[in-house]
Amino acid sequence: MAIIEASNRAYLLAYQRNARLMRLLEQVAAIDDNVRELRLRRGRTFVERNARSIRDLQARGIADPDVDPLLAATALSAMVGRMAYTTYVIGEESDLEQLVTTLTRLWANALRIPDDALQVQEK
């Protein structure tokens, strides 16, 4: 869980630092095909990395083997990205630590990672 938590925290902090740029990219991507394609490629990079991590967790018997890794990575990445957008661009106030904790728990729950498996792996 520490890796998921650290990844979520790093993403949220980077998004927070770059909120104005992220807002602009979102707006321009809606009207410019080149920018939209750039954002899609950037997003795919994160999704593919997350899918590899999910496959690894499945291979180690930690995550639900019946979950499609690529689809799960796409959905979970979208969840974190949209929360970052809602918080730092739209301005829906949320405490960083509460965001990190909640998003990390949702990740673990979605992959049906038991708490005890995470504690054993982190030691």
Task: List the predicted regions and their residue ranges.
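Short, hydrophobic secondary-structure boundary micro-motifs
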Residues: 22-25, 37-38, 66, 119-120
